[in-house]
Curated annotation (Swiss-Prot):
One of its GO terms (molecular function) is RNA binding. It comes from Escherichia coli O7:K1 (strain IAI39 / ExPEC). Residues 245-390 form the Helicase C-terminal domain. Residues 40-219 form the Helicase ATP-binding domain. Keywords: ATP-binding, Cytoplasm, Helicase, Hydrolase, Nucleotide-binding, RNA-binding. This is ATP-dependent RNA helicase RhlB. It holds the Pfam family Helicase_C. Its main location: cytoplasm. A motif (DEAD box) lies at residues 165-168.
Amino acid sequence: MSKTHLTEQKFSDFALHPKVVEALEKKGFHNCTPIQALALPLTLAGRDVAGQAQTGTGKTMAFLTSTFHYLLSHPAIADRKVNQPRALIMAPTRELAVQIHADAEPLAQATGLKLGLAYGGDGYDKQLKVLESGVDILIGTTGRLIDYAKQNHINLGAIQVVVLDEADRMYDLGFIKDIRWLFRRMPPANQRLNMLFSATLSYRVRELAFEQMNNAEYIEVEPEQKTGHRIKEELFYPSNEEKMRLLQTLIEEEWPDRAIIFANTKHRCEEIWGHLAADGHRVGLLTGDVAQKKRLRILDEFTRGDLDILVATDVAARGLHIPAVTHVFNYDLPDDCEDYVHRIGRTGRAGASGHSISLACEEYALNLPAIETYIGHSIPVSKYNPDALMTDLPKPLRLTRPRTGNGPRRTGTPRNRRRSG
């Protein structure tokens, strides 16, 4: 994999706690990404940071490194109780909270700091058992955090570090009141280290930073470039009748190693899953209706390569670290132009190249002008031959069938149907 996304700045160049540096290097992290190189000098000096960087540029490791260093370098608040964590990391989704926790585990093992995880959906008693033994760093979603706080299972009066990840998504999902509720139960902003990281820093996010942080420094990486230069973008104009057949034909032509297909509704995602599973693809479905344990299992299978294709709503578009995604298909153009950037940001990460293919159908083509205005360029248009689209397609599976979330392993080679233009 290309290392061109890294800077010459090494973690060992900073005055980081030796245990943190050792843990990073053990995991193969030696050089900083641009956002890490900008953030660490500030957080090591005790400055608050509001950071913007494109997805996949290392935001998570930037705030984890800062958090572990700060806790190791500063004593806990006097008379701290067992139910009082020292650091709180808030994430908008369960999947992102789980991912952050997984990324933090090597640092926790190396430093002896204890991690806790709190998210809704399931695992209430299991999560609570960990919290009752005492944790240093608590990672979670706002709803479950508030639930535990109201029952006094956790107390935020000894918080020394706060991280808000994907703050713009917090607004999108309506969590801003929850965030403010949690902040009101912490020590004042000038008595803690505050970090906010997001792929976009809108006016409302900056307002939140002004309100809840202590004179935060704003840092940005590639702020003018909305879409990664390593991502090849492509646009088709199918009719509604030809849209599904075009998608399946493109998949057969591209034969992606690992692809994510985004649609705007759970019903549309289920429909796409049914067609692809029936056609023999190893495909998983990720929507809000999928049970939490199954969602985590599907993400794990996709990451391991047991699934080739993931069909998802935008719940999977923000913050998740899924390596080596080669293709992103926008089956529906998103209603929010920022979601276009976050979707295609699933590919072309960490120095790799990627391919984004969007279908501007009759229903969602009206979203295209706003998207192109936002990203600052027109998406190159490709044509296709309607007569060359796949026709010998099996009847789609229904979601209630036992093979939900997984199809048989693909065999053979792609069918020889080439597009025109």
